[in-house]
Amino acid sequence: MQGQTQSISFDGREIRLTTGRYAPQAGGSVMMECGDTAVLVTATRSTGREGIDFLPLICDYEERLYAAGRIPGSFMRREGRPPERATLIARLIDRPMRPLFPSWMRDDLQIVATCLSLDERVPADVLAVTGASMATLLASIPFQGPMAAVRVGLLGDDFVLNPSYREIERGDLDLVVAGTPDGVVMVEAGANQLPQGDVIEAIDFGYEAVCELIKAQQTILKDAGIKQVQPEPPTQDQDTKLSTYLEKNCSKSIGEVLKQFEQTKAERDSKLDAIKAKTAEAIDSLKEDDAVRKSVNANSKVLSNNFKALTKKLMREQIIKQGKRVDGRKLDEVRPISSAAGVLPKRVHGSGLFQRGLTQVLSTATLGTPSDAQEMDDLNPGPEKTYLHHYNFPPYSVGETRPMRSPGRREVGHGSLAERAIIPVLPPKDSFPYVLRVVSEVLSSNGSTSMGSVCGSTLALMDAGVPLKAPVSGAAMGLIKEDAEIRILTDIQGIEDFLGDMDFKVAGTKDGITALQMDMKITGLPVKTIAEAVNQARPARIHILEKMLEAIDAPRTTLSPHAPRLLSFRIDPELIGTVIGPGGRTIKGITERTNTKIDIEDGGIVTIASHDGAAAEAAQRIIEGLTRKVNEGEVFTGTITRIIPIGAFVEILPGKEGMIHISQLSEARVEKVDDVVKVGDQVTVRIREIDNRGRINLTLRGVPQNGEETQSEPAPTPVAPLN
């Protein structure tokens, strides 16, 4: 079980690909290792299913908590459903792999990547993507690879290849680039308002490293004596005759529909459906032994698929040769835009409605307390999430009916992209300590709903009074490539996404890019073409941003009356235990007395949440009193809180008490404490002593009462005593 290992070094870090040792019954397998991170990737192919018209590819990413030396916290102590992070990595594998399989393939394909060991310095996702390509090649599956992926970070002015988790958090860029020998096939990025030139340079930097990993895969195949299987479409004479028949009988009528630029999407779809129905009737009237009729009768979907292929061809020709899109727009023109803020009652903390053409997204923003942060129950060692973006895509948004189920991979992916786009402009936690949740409801979809979610989120957050550093907008770019002819499309709609070769989403502020996501339907593009798309997206983004700012030009200065009020301040971390008290009694008493919610971080940051600002301030005074250091000799005016036979307790600061011994109540002898003071009395005391246990001993002797002497500390606002 020795296997074969190929190693490659990047910036002093070695990546190892081991084949022929693990999972011998899988079609192909490879162990990808870097540092102490190890990911086993397998690819398996089984017999195709009858009657399907798509590639049945499944990509899974599995996390095992033993990889980080942990035991699951569930009742069964076993991993449950994949966490969101695993879903996103599965999509990261799928997106560059899917376009590299032949369009005619109908065999079931499954790629499974399992993280067996995780080094916090080496993220596992890009290893899994590269491993998917290697395993597929070893399985002798028709595949237009090799393909590889790397991550690029930016620390200061230097690009870093495959940075650690900490370097990603500290840097201004988190970019994943996947490519083939033909060019870049996938890009995923989050950036801190980075200039376009820097992002393009990073993509070029990453693609150079991708080429090295591609060579390593080719070397493994050569050393193992495995010849890569080249995709060769099966010859189906009947389908060829059907294509010829449709081209002869339908091209003119389809072309006329595509040139009716003023029609709506529904009208265009209806006319195309009518042409297809009429064609089906004509085919049904042909002789029974006619090859075209036999082809359609043999497979109910073959007519629909060939009709779509012809429509795609004609639409692409119209764009390439005439520069005309199906709705009459120029190649760089954005659809009509409308936006509004505050469209829902203020019980919703913030709301925004964004519409571009037929794409309409309603976003809402909710402000929560630090305890609402999401704990990440996965292998990723990152902190709690304090900004959440959830994306919903109901069936009515495309005029369809289907059961409403929990969010799928697409919803998770689109929500993550919109989340990435907004995070760089969120206010610092110490000045705005709220946990934020944005939900984007897609009310109507005709292309680029994820970028519509970004725009709607900006409107909702500004309406909620979140002081964003800058507003963010986004646009989706498309591409049509026919041989050497390339046309880049701005703000693609649904049919252009479906029939085009690229879906490139670009989000950012007027100063720079915050998120990118590029998916291809071809085997790769040169970086130069990607740069053209990024540059063409900027005027569109700025135009969209200007339209959004017409609805709300700055964050609101007040929060919704139904949003919680937060106070945040810092205390000495060594005094956290004083605030919490034995068994949590002190902090529980403060929250019950003031009707507030209090969170304390390990670093000493205290956050108080309440719907009543005065109550939050009262809780703050108590905590500041508990943590304020007092000194012997200081004079305070306080309230008698309780009396015992040997003395009286005085609250000298909110939450901080000292005791006056009976002998310190007066210069004369005192028989009973309540002969001198009673509960509720206001007295001026001096700190006589602080013992080695921190107990404060007070005295009334020699201390003028009734404000006859200047106090070293102003009298605190009276509050009820702690239990």
Curated annotation (Swiss-Prot):
Residue ranges constituting the KH domain according to the UniProt record: 564-623
Region called Disordered, residue ranges: 701-723
Subcellular location: Cytoplasm
EC code(s) of this entry: 2.7.7.8
GO CC terms of this entry: cytosol
Domain S1 motif: 633-701
A Pfam family of this chain: KH_1
CDD domains (UniProt xref): KH-I_PNPase, RNase_PH_PNPase_1, RNase_PH_PNPase_2
Main location: cytoplasm
Annotated binding of Mg(2+), by residue: 497, 503
SUPFAM superfamilies reported for this sequence: Eukaryotic type KH-domain (KH-domain type I), Nucleic acid-binding proteins, Ribonuclease PH domain 2-like, Ribosomal protein S5 domain 2-like
Reactions catalysed: RNA(n+1) + phosphate = RNA(n) + a ribonucleoside 5'-diphosphate
Gene it is expressed from: pnp
GO molecular function annotations of the record: 3'-5'-RNA exonuclease activity; magnesium ion binding; polyribonucleotide nucleotidyltransferase activity; RNA binding
Gene3D superfamilies tied to this protein: GHMP Kinase, N-terminal domain, K Homology domain, type 1, Nucleic acid-binding proteins
Any Gene Ontology biological process: mRNA catabolic process
Disulfide bonding pattern of the chain: none
Physiological role: Involved in mRNA degradation. Catalyzes the phosphorolysis of single-stranded polyribonucleotides processively in the 3'- to 5'-direction.
The keyword Mitochondrion appears for this protein: no
Protein name, entry field: Polyribonucleotide nucleotidyltransferase
Names of the cofactor(s): Mg(2+)
InterPro entries per the UniProt record, alphabetical: ExoRNase_PH_dom1 (IPR001247), ExoRNase_PH_dom2 (IPR015847), ExoRNase_PH_dom2_sf (IPR036345), KH_dom (IPR004087), KH_dom_type_1 (IPR004088), KH_dom_type_1_sf (IPR036612), NA-bd_OB-fold (IPR012340), PNPase (IPR012162)
Membership in a protein family: Belongs to the polyribonucleotide nucleotidyltransferase family.
Keywords assigned by UniProt, alphabetized: Cytoplasm, Magnesium, Metal-binding, Nucleotidyltransferase, RNA-binding, Transferase
